[in-house]
Amino acid sequence: SHSDIGTEIADNPRLQKTDRAQFIAMMEHLDLAAPTHLTEALRTNLSGAKTVAGLLADAAARVPFVAMDDLAAALAAGNAGYVLLDVREKDAFDAGHIAGALHLPRGQLELRVNDMLPDPTARILTICEFGRISTLAAATLRDLGFTRAAALDGGVKAWREAGLPLADG
């Protein structure tokens, strides 16, 4: 259903209270459950910060994506053209990763990337489970001067579902 502000003010009993204390007492008496994502919404509204969806959208707007089929074809031809960087946690990486991928968890990226990948001109392809964390990782790499970083579209989940090979351990 839908409504407009005028109708709500006229008809909604919760909006009939003009005294702040009465309104608070009435709302507390209803004992309503807190809305989902209330903490994030409050933090965002109070600080002016971005939401997770906003961070992902900003990152996706400035990161190129590599299609799963393009990477699979390049790997089959023996030349990925990228340094593959799997940013998932160790247990996920060990359970199955794209052959040849280096492992650097997203939580350690900023601290360890320069030691692991000293060439800022390298073409780096970040990989995660669903394609979201790898997007953030690629954006971070670009912020750190790795200007050719990209993200695998769809992640390992899509790779697995397509029946493409994964290496263990």
PLM region descriptions:
Residues 60-77:
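A short, well-structured juxtamembrane/interface segment
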